[in-house]
């Protein structure tokens, strides 16, 4: 965390990194605050129209799903409804391949 490519919408305990194309990836850990991640999701959706959320491990996936639900509430106040499309993604961390859950979030 502390990467120089993070946006203002990055939640404490989460890291936003540029992805392919225009989609940003928010990396969520089990220690991430779901409300802070939700604010980051809502901000990026408003600004760019879509965001991917990546989580590894049950606790991180739980926080990411809660954040998506909370972000939906924030965005509904602005008349924006979202959909969450889950998928698996293989990532390499410290030389070891891990499977992450990736949530692609976009307007409905």
Give the label of every model feature segment.
Residues 32, 56-59:
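Short beta->alpha linker loops
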Residues 1-13:
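N-terminal acidic, proline/glycine-rich, low-complexity intrinsically disordered segments
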Residues 22-50, 64-68, 72:
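Conserved mixed alpha/beta catalytic, RNA-binding, or beta-rich assembly cores of soluble enzyme
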Residues 58-84:
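Short, hydrophobic/π-rich interface segment
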Residues 11-23:
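N-terminal intrinsically disordered, low-complexity tails
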Residues 76-108:
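C-terminal edge-of-domain segments
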